[in-house]
A protein has these predicted regions:
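Juxtamembrane intracellular "pre-TM" segments in multi-pass secondary transporters
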Residues: 1-5, 178-211, 390-395
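Helix-loop boundary and gating motifs at the non-cytosolic
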Residues: 2-51, 199-239
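Hydrophobic core of transmembrane alpha-helices in multi-pass small-molecule transporters
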Residues: 16, 94-109, 290-304
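Helix-to-loop junctions at the C-terminal end of transmembrane segments
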Residues: 57-69, 151, 250-263, 348-349
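Structural signature of the two symmetry-related core transmembrane helices
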Residues: 72-86, 164, 266-280, 361
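Cytoplasmic helix-loop-helix junction between adjacent transmembrane helices
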Residues: 101-138
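Symmetry-related core transmembrane helices of the 12-TM Major Facilitator Superfamily/SLC fold
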Residues: 159-175, 357-373
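C-terminal transmembrane helical hairpin of 12-TM major facilitator-type secondary transporters
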Residues: 265-309
Length: 395
């Protein structure tokens, strides 16, 4: 018991250190390569590879968690995160493509969420999962401003080595102190999809469409558009940092006081319907200040919806096969991200920035409509969910 009380902080340290690096790359990659004349579509392809890998990552991670155990999978992910940062030392786009794809496969969210499911009391899980995922966004924001500042004074290689040190230290801490857990249910890969409850699939699909909407303008278009408005790379990093820190704080604190008596299904539909006009408003925001106001309005609504998605994700996942249920959910929640990034890059180059926001509005609308298929109230009655459950083995 003494050992397990530090489990969530150790997992959070590793998860947030990986998010720090991912956040830095969100700023470093588009700014660095755009300054060297690389086209928007080619930069978008780098992020497309990352998002494309995220489609396949959850099932791979889920199977590894189910077969290898939680600790070995978590440490392996952090170690690879550290190693591939060195790929930027090789002046060849092949290694950049490889780094983007491999980093996308290292989906730390599921590696962390399984620990929340099994190593925390059920009444605390809603807050802990939203705190972990919310402050992950804040860590990403800190990485963005850190990356923007460091790339201004250091080479891209040295900048990435600094961030690699954070994940390396987190991996060493996990090796020493993180407990292991083995799931007893071992399901054949080809039977996973059919064994997962329909409500988890519906929830994942809806959140996937919402994620696709955000990434359609928030990954490549946002930093490039801000640069197009004449702002400095440091300002771009500051805006993106503030955006993600804002999201992280909203998710974390809103989850503490959210009223779960409100039906999540209706709230998710309402949030989606409100985001449609906000997405369209981005295309009409002609000045920098107005544009930023609309961006943060979008992030406020998105973050509020995210609290309910995160809560229902943990609530719907079974204790016996947590990793496989979450693998299905996160696969669906990631499937539209590369589509949003890649298609918006083509649309922007062909028709202008406004088309990225039109695409975003379309994704949001489909997300809201998908919520109609969710159950009217959470019906998950499974009370097994902490490290004492008989369906798992702690080591």
């Amino acid at each position: 018991m003494e050992r397990t009380k530090w489990t969530i902080p150790i997992v959070a340290l590793g998860y947030w250190s990986a998010a720090l690096t991912n956040g830095a790359l969100r700023v470093i990659v588009p700014i660095y390569f755009a300054s060297r004349g690389v086209s928007i579509s080619k930069i978008a392809f780098l992020f497309f590879l990352f998002k494309f890998a995220e489609i396949f990552a959850p099932f791979g991670i889920g199977v590894m968690l189910n077969r290898w155990g939680y600790k070995r999978t978590f440490i392996t992910g952090l170690a690879i995160h550290s190693v591939i940062s060195a790929f930027y030392m090789v002046p060849n786009f092949f290694f950049l493509y490889l780094e983007r794809f491999v980093r996308g496969l290292l989906y730390m969210a599921d590696m962390s969420a399984v620990y929340v499911k099994h190593f925390s009391a059920k009444e605390n899980q809603r807050f802990l999962i939203n705190m972990m995922l919310g402050l992950k966004e804040a860590s990403k924001g800190v990485g963005m401003i850190g990356g923007g500042l460091l790339i201004a004074i250091l080479t891209i290689e040295n900048t990435l080595l600094i961030f690699a040190a954070f994940t390396a230290v987190s991996a060493l801490v996990a090796v020493k102190y993180l407990p292991d857990l083995q799931e007893q249910v071992k399901m054949p890969v080809l039977k996973i999809w059919g064994a997962v409850d329909r409500k988890i699939k519906t929830l994942g699909l809806s959140f996937g469409l919402l994620n696709g909407a955000l990434d359609a303008w928030g990954v490549v278009v946002l930093p490039v558009y801000l640069t197009h408005l004449g702002v400095t790379p440091t300002f771009v990093g500051t805006v993106m940092m503030a955006e993600y820190v804002f999201q992280g704080l909203i998710v974390t604190f809103f989850s503490k006081y959210v009223n779960l008596r409100w039906e999540p299904r209706k709230l998710l539909m309402l949030a989606g319907l409100l985001l449609v006009p906000v997405s369209l408003a981005l295309s009409f925001a002609a000045t920098l200040h107005l544009f930023l106001i609309v961006v943060f309005t979008y992030m406020f609504l998105f973050s509020g919806a995210m609290v309910y998605y995160n809560h229902l994700m943990i609530e719907f996942a079974s204790a016996e096969k947590t990793s496989l249920d979450l693998a299905t959910y996160t696969t669906l929640s990631n499937i539209f991200k590369p589509i949003g990034v890649f298609v918006s890059g083509i649309l922007v180059e062909s028709f202008g920035f406004g088309w990225a926001y039109y695409l975003s509005a379309l994704f949001v609308l489909f997300s809201a409509l998908t919520c109609i298929a969710l159950p009217k109230a959470a019906t998950q009655k499974d009370q097994a969910g902490d490290y004492r459950t008989e369906s798992v083995t702690v080591r």
